[in-house]
Regions:
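Extended, low-complexity cationic-aromatic segments
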Residues: 12, 34-121, 222-225
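RNase H-like DDE/DDD metal-dependent nuclease/strand-transfer catalytic core used by mobile genetic elements
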Residues: 67, 113-160
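RNase H-like polynucleotidyl transferase catalytic core
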Residues: 21, 77-86, 152-172, 188
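Short beta-strand segments
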Residues: 55-57, 132-138, 161-164, 218
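Generic structural signal for small/hydrophobic residues in well-ordered secondary structure
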Residues: 6, 58-60, 94, 120, ...
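C-terminal anion-handling pockets and recognition modules
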Residues: 5, 50-52, 173-227
Length: 227
């Protein structure tokens, strides 16, 4: 049977070609469901009772040698894009809220406990007296003894919670990372690290001025639980 005929039958039966979602095989569906049905509702209830603010956090990186985008060219003539011969990168940690607030910090070094604590200090300061309920993934540094001790000394100001393992689709900040990379890679490639950082910072500041854009991440079916 010709492939085209198979496609016609599938279309009649209600099937369409779609890009599959990727899900780690280590993910435990029962743990995810428990988070949705029990853990997150408890966090939300506490945040309301304590006049707190729930924030979702994540880290990402931008590299000069990452390739994205396509271009048109005659058959057999691959288009050439001029890029820097040097390799450089910048890292970012950020948080979003379902009210459309966005906070971020750029850093060049590896994410260590002191770097994370520096960002957490900023979150406390920016919260203006409200307690921060911060939801993170299970990166090792998030569970480090230094971070746990630092947060433990500030229980009235900040508390950390953790998503189920291997469940990035539950984190709205992942959608921010995708948004950033899409916007930052448009136009000419950055020529050096400073230019890359300026571009990332510019995109993030524009997004800070568009709370409706941040809120739109929470309309995704996977994130609707947190809207």
């Amino acid at each position: 049977m010709p492939v085209r005929t198979v496609g016609e039958y599938l279309k009649r039966w209600g099937y369409t070609p779609q890009r599959p979602l990727h899900r780690a095989y280590q993910q435990k569906p029962e743990v995810v469901q428990h988070w949705l049905d029990n853990e997150y509702p408890r966090i939300a209830q506490r945040a309301r009772a304590e006049n707190g603010e729930i924030q979702w956090g994540d880290e990402t990186g931008m590299r000069s040698d990452s390739h994205a985008g396509r271009s048109y060219a005659p058959i057999g003539e691959t288009p050439v894009r001029l890029v820097s011969g040097s390799r450089f990168s910048t890292n970012m940690i950020s948080t979003v809220t379902n009210r459309g607030k966005l906070r971020f910090m750029l850093y060049r070094e590896t994410l260590t406990a002191p770097v994370l604590i520096r960002f957490l200090s900023r979150l406390i300061r920016d919260a203006q007296g409200r307690k921060v309920f911060l939801i993170l993934d299970n990166l090792r540094v998030h569970h480090s003894k230094k971070v746990s001790a630092w947060v433990g000394d500030r229980k009235e100001q900040i508390e950390l919670f953790f998503l189920p393992a291997y469940a990035p689709e539950l984190n709205p900040d992942e959608y921010l990372n995708c948004d950033l990379k899409h916007q930052a890679r448009t136009g000419l490639p950055a020529r050096n690290q400073d230019e890359l950082e300026r571009r990332v910072r510019s995109v993030m500041r524009r997004l800070q001025l568009r709370p409706q854009r941040i809120r739109s991440y929470f309309r995704h079916p996977r994130i609707a639980y947190a809207a």
